[in-house]
Amino acid sequence: MALIQHGSVSGTSAVRLSFSSSVSPPSSSPPLSRVSLNFQSEKKSCYRRMICRAMVQDSVQGIPSVYAREMERLSAKESLILAFNDAGGFEALVTGKITDMQKIDVNERITNLERLNPTPRPTTSPYLEGRWSFEWFGVNTPGSLAVRVMFERFPSTLVSLSNMEIFIKDNNTKATANIKLLNSIENKITLSSKLTIEGPLRMKEEYLEGLLESPTVIEEAVPDQLRGLLGQATTTLQQLPEPIKDTLANGLRIPLGGTYQRFFMISYLDDEILIVRDTAGVPEVLTRVETSSPMSSSSVVENLEYNS
């Protein structure tokens, strides 16, 4: 193998030289028993040549195949992101403006990327931690339920959901939805939960607490017809007792105590994209908000060889 690395001779020549030189030519008239022993020795030597030649071929052919798979994975990631953009992105998803053709196209590309998952044990991978932004979610996921409740009570002209993020650290999560009313009042809804590892791919999520933060008013964006109402509301809030004002300032907390839980499976994870599926198989796709250090080439090779 040293000869192969320095490029002095080919892999096949190195194997032939190393083993052919060890076999001495037979004598002119050897005894029958000696011929039999030499035959066994040559047979074993032949086996050794075949094994070593196969090892050399695997080492030479394995590296291109690993990186070809890596290039295929990167292409599948780019294809999925393009499908999100073509479908209208997060805004089109939450407002229900995505067509069935766009949905099936996105789901097909999700499946193509999942089969190239480079992380064999995502539930214990350090890549799982960090801040993630929701790009895609299905009908029965927590994200879609929150959107459905919100838009059932308020028309889309009055309320909008700008983005949804989740922060994962030490098996604890904090999901945040940023809501804007009348394009002038911003509010955040936060849902805290605890994650439990159930296996290499499977996790359990228990919801602990919900928090409705105090709204922030963008005064310059308030319509003229509502400025009077805003002034009256501000005056009323200032006249409230201090305990109530403190409660409103700190937000309204809703203890859940682990009453609600769900199971999900991580079907894909790298340093940029996270894909999970619930018990019904519905996918959620998230992209990393905070950039992390890229995967080294050695870790890519290790993970892909594990899956191959």
Swiss-Prot record:
A Gene Ontology term for the protein's cellular component: chloroplast thylakoid membrane
Cysteine pairings via disulfide bonds: none
InterPro entries per UniProt: PAP, PAP/fibrillin_dom
Presequence positions on this chain: 1-55
UniProt keyword terms in alphabetical order: Chloroplast, Plastid, Transit peptide
Compartments in which it is found: Plastid, Chloroplast, Plastoglobule
Chief location: plastid
Entry similarity comment: Belongs to the PAP/fibrillin family.
Protein name as annotated: Probable plastid-lipid-associated protein 9, chloroplastic
Organism: Arabidopsis thaliana (Mouse-ear cress)
High-level lineage: Eukaryota, Viridiplantae, Streptophyta, Embryophyta, Tracheophyta
Originating gene: PAP9
